[in-house]
Amino acid sequence: MANYLTAKLPGIGGSIKTCPDDFLVEELPLYPTCGEGEHLYLEVEKRGMTTFELLKRLSRALQVNERAMGYAGLKDAQATTRQFISVTDCSAEQALALQLQDIRILSARRHRNKLRLGHLAGNRFTITIRDIDSDALEKARDILHVLQMTGVPNFFGEQRYGALGNSHLIGQAIVQKNFSQAAAHIIGDPDKIIHPEWRQGAILYAENRLEEAEQALPRRMRNERNLVRSLRQGRSAEKAVRRLPGKLLRLYLSAYQSHLFDRLVSMRLESLETLWTGDIAYKHDNGACFLVTDAALEQPRADRFEISPTAPLFGHKVMMAEAQAGILEQALLAKEGITPDDFRLGAGLSMPGERRPLRIPISETASNQQGNELELSFSLPKGSFATTVLHEVMKTDV
C-alpha cells in the first residue's frame, strides 16, 4: 500500500513488533455464551504462535479431537492474542488447570453450538510503537480523528501475498488460465529468494532441469517438489498445478481477489465516504448490499456511517456496480484481460465473489505516549486489518 487517506498529515514513523507483547489482539465475541450446552468456550491467551499451533497444543493437553475444536478467526503469530476456542468432552476445571508455555486459559464457559469461522464481531488492538519523536502523540491523534470521521480504508494489504509477495500473481495466472506462469511463480523468482537451497532449485527449474530442481528444493517444500515432479512425469502445467491442495490454490485466488479490491480502494481513496449513483452500498448493521439509484438521497446515511460504497471481490456470481462505479470495475477487469466468469474454475476452485465495503469504522480509540514509545488502542470490525491503521499513523511500510 503506497496510498494514504491522511496524506496531508505527517506520520509518526517508528517500529512495531519488536516483541510479541508490543502487539495485543483481543477477539470481540459475536454473541454471549449461555452457560449451558456440550461446547466449552475457552478464552485463551497465546503468545508468539499461530492459531493452528494453539489448536494442536490444546488438543494434546486436553486429549480432545482437534477437528472437533472451533475458532472464530486466525490470529497473528507475531503477537500476544486473546481468542475463543470451543471444545467438547472437556470440563471447565480441566481446562482452567492447564499450565502450558505461552498459553493461558483466561475463562471457560459453556454454550450450545460449536464456534465457527466468522463468529466474531471484531478485534481490539493495543499496539506499542517504538522509536518515535516527542510530538508523535499529537500527530497520531490528528490522524485518528480523520479516520474516525471518514472511516479506515478497507485495504487487505500485502500480508496475503506470501513469503515472496507473489501469491496474487499466482492467482492471476490461474484465473487467466496461464498455468505455466502460475507454476513459475509458485517455484519463485531466483532473484527474490534468499534461502540458498530454494534459490538453487528455482534456478534449475528456470533452466528446465526438472529432476535436479526437485532434488535441490528443500524437503519441507512438499507442494513445490510435487509440482516439479508432476511436470517431470509429463503432466501438463494445468494438471500439475491443479494437483496441488485445493486450500492452497484457493489462497492464491483469494490473494488475487484482494489485490484487485485494493486497487479499487486506491482509485476512490479521496472520497471513500461518498456514494455514487450506481454504487452497490453496504449496510454496516447487517452486511446486506443494495444498488444506489439516487446517491444524493442515500448520502445522509453514508454520512452517519450506516452505509458505505463497496468494491467487488471479483467472482462469477458477484453483483457488479453500474454507471460510473461500474465503469471503474469493468475497466480494471479489461486491463487484467478477464471477466467475472473467468473465476468459474471448477474442481472446487470456483470463486463466487462478494462485495466488500471500501471503508470500515474505527472505534474505542486511545493513545498514550511515554518517552519514545506510543501505545495505540482501537477496535475494528471482523475481516479488517490493524496494519491499515498503522500504515496511516506511521506512514511507513508495516
UniProtKB/Swiss-Prot annotation:
Gene Ontology terms for molecular function: RNA binding; tRNA pseudouridine(13) synthase activity
Key words, A-Z: Isomerase, tRNA processing
Cross-referenced InterPro entries: PsdUridine_synth_cat_dom_sf, PsdUridine_synth_TruD, PsdUridine_synth_TruD_CS, PsdUridine_synth_TruD_insert, TruD_catalytic, TruD_pseudoU_synthase
BP GO terms, sorted: tRNA pseudouridine synthesis
Residues covered by the TRUD domain: 151-360
Cellular component terms per the entry's GO annotation: cytosol
Catalytic activity: uridine(13) in tRNA = pseudouridine(13) in tRNA
Keyword Coiled coil: no
Residues of the active site: 76 (nucleophile)
EC number per UniProt: 5.4.99.27
Gene3D superfamilies: 1.10.1510.30, 3.30.70.3160, TruD, catalytic domain
Biological role stated in the UniProt entry: Responsible for synthesis of pseudouridine from uracil-13 in transfer RNAs.
Similarity remark: Belongs to the pseudouridine synthase TruD family.
Name assigned to this protein: tRNA pseudouridine synthase D
